[in-house]
């Protein structure tokens, strides 16, 4: 989370038209009571930590690879991203509690702010982001009940669509590294 209160969200799967960037962002903003326009997607590095959870599960961890396909992205990552949002929410609330010297149960979140229900004071997520980064990570954050959902399950515009339309979206073919060499087939050796 930035000091402007935006989320930089890494997604370890490829957006191929299935809407996964939006879906996983929805899982996080649901828990934080934010909006999709407060999310910025960033690329993740290749690492076994980002192995496809569904594929790993069904192969007893024999195939721990980072892969997109088979409709496994949301099934595999959705609950993890909700937990990321819930963890961030609890850390932000705890940062506000520390700043106000107040018990966390007297605080609530509302529109990217923490509200002190005793004094009425508010602090934005941006104001709390650095302090929240110093808070111990909760081991079992409380996930919202389905009945409380405001984002998940609701029709929303996909937040990455504009970048695809205006050409600013980044794809694998856009990779540019210092000294990179590109290769292509000049002419296919066979017809068809």
Where is each model-derived feature located?
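Cofactor-binding beta-sheet edge motifs in enzyme active sites
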Residues: 1-192
